[in-house]
Amino acid sequence: AATAATAATAATAATAATAATAATAATAATA
């Protein structure tokens, strides 16, 4: 259970990082 929770947390963090990177790229492209 702990391993699954850790994996889910890591996946969520990776998704958030990807979204942040995409937002940054979009902002840079707009600017």
Curated annotation (Swiss-Prot):
The keyword Transmembrane does not apply. Keywords: Antifreeze protein, Glycoprotein, Repeat, Secreted. Glycans are attached at T3, T6, T9, T12, T15, T18, T21, T24, T27, T30. O-linked glycans consist of Gal-GalNAc disaccharides. The three proteins may differ only in the number of repeating units of -Ala-Ala-Thr-. GO terms for cellular component: extracellular region. It is found in: Secreted. The keyword Repeat applies. The two small glycopeptides are present in a much higher concentration (5 times by weight) than the HMW glycoproteins but produce only a small depression effect. The exact physiological role of the small glycopeptides is not known. The three major glycoproteins (3, 4, and 5) have the same N-terminal sequence, A-A-T-A-A-T, and C-terminal Ala. Each protein is composed only of Ala and Thr residues in a ratio of 2:1 and arranged in the repeating sequence -A-A-T-. Antifreeze proteins lower the blood freezing point. This fish lives in antarctic waters where it experiences water temperatures near -1.9 degrees Celsius. Its blood has a freezing point of about -2.0 degrees Celsius, and 30% of the freezing-point depression is due mainly to the 3 major high molecular weight glycoproteins in the plasma. This is Ice-structuring glycoprotein 3. The lineage of its organism: Eukaryota, Metazoa, Chordata, Craniata, Vertebrata.
